[in-house]
């Protein structure tokens, strides 16, 4: 057993006691630490792989039960936001587990991006370890309280305007929006984009911005606003 980890402290934060504490140690062992430590033979990567699937199942089930009227596409949009690296990093922070990560000297976390990746992987690995040791129930008990409230999940479900417009046109018109691009110059003289979004050859919205992505977003939002689309999925709130 690794003497650098206070198993009891970590278990207290998880509110879960391992029957196989070695699983927890492995989950906390970054691959870089194993590479630099001759006595360590296992790292967190396999548990991370398992934990990713466990997290996906738990979040899918949670959303399915919480929003019985939501369609599959909208649920998928919310799930993606709840299981991405940024969210998993936040779960690690919320549990206060980051300080227990065993990481190699050559792999010290240098910036926010590095922290997000390392902490996200850590959460998934711990979830995989909990699942192997105690099954789905304790993994669910750890995860669900970390998820946003029902009210806060709704904006995640709506997604960005492009996705919402695509879902709308597919569902109601069985077609996809088409984006047309033209060069545009801002009042300050900067080069940008003028984008029109067409549905069934009809212009639904326009957007002007310096970046193509932002102009598309503005055009899609104008299309949604102009057609006064009321998302029926809000009935679940």
Swiss-Prot record:
GO terms for molecular function: double-stranded RNA binding; metal ion binding; ribonuclease III activity; rRNA binding. GO terms for biological process: mRNA processing; regulation of gene expression; rRNA processing; tRNA processing. It catalyses: Endonucleolytic cleavage to 5'-phosphomonoester. Its main location: cytoplasm. Mg(2+) binds at residues 48, 121, 124. Keywords: Cytoplasm, Endonuclease, Hydrolase, Magnesium, Metal-binding, mRNA processing, Nuclease, RNA-binding, rRNA processing, rRNA-binding, tRNA processing. Its EC number is 3.1.26.3. One of its GO terms (cellular component) is cytoplasm. Residues 160-229 form the DRBM domain. It is found in: Cytoplasm. It is an enzyme of class 3 (hydrolase). The active site is at 52, 124. Residues 7-135 form the RNase III domain. It holds the Pfam family dsrm. Its cofactor is Mg(2+). Digests double-stranded RNA. Involved in the processing of primary rRNA transcript to yield the immediate precursors to the large and small rRNAs (23S and 16S). Processes some mRNAs, and tRNAs when they are encoded in the rRNA operon. Processes pre-crRNA and tracrRNA of type II CRISPR loci if present in the organism. Belongs to the ribonuclease III family. Homodimer. This is Ribonuclease 3.
């Amino acid at each position: 057993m690794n003497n650098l980890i206070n198993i009891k402290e970590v278990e207290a934060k998880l509110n879960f006691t391992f029957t196989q504490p070695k699983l927890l140690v492995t989950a906390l062992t970054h691959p870089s630490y194993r590479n630099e430590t001759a006595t360590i033979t296992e790292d967190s990567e396999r548990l991370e792989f398992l934990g990713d699937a466990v997290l996906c199942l738990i979040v899918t089930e949670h959303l399915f039960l919480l929003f019985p009227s939501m369609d599959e596409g909208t649920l998928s949009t919310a799930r993606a936001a709840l299981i991405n690296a940024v969210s998993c990093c936040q779960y690690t922070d919320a549990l206060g587990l980051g300080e227990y990560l065993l990481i190699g000297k050559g792999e010290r976390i240098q910036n926010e991006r590095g922290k997000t990746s390392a902490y996200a992987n850590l959460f998934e690995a711990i979830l995989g370890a909990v699942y192997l040791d105690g099954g789905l129930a304790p993994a669910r008990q750890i995860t669900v309280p970390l998820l946003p409230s029902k009210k806060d999940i709704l904006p995640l479900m709506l997604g960005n305007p492009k996705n919402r417009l695509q879902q709308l046109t597919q569902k109601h018109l069985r077609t996809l929006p088409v984006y047309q691009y033209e060069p545009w110059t801002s009042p300050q003289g900067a080069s940008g984009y003028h984008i029109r979004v067409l549905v069934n050859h009809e212009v639904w919205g326009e957007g002007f911005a310096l970046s193509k992505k932002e102009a598309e977003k503005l055009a899609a939002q104008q299309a949604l606003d102009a057609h006064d689309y009321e998302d029926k999925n809000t009935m679940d709130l």
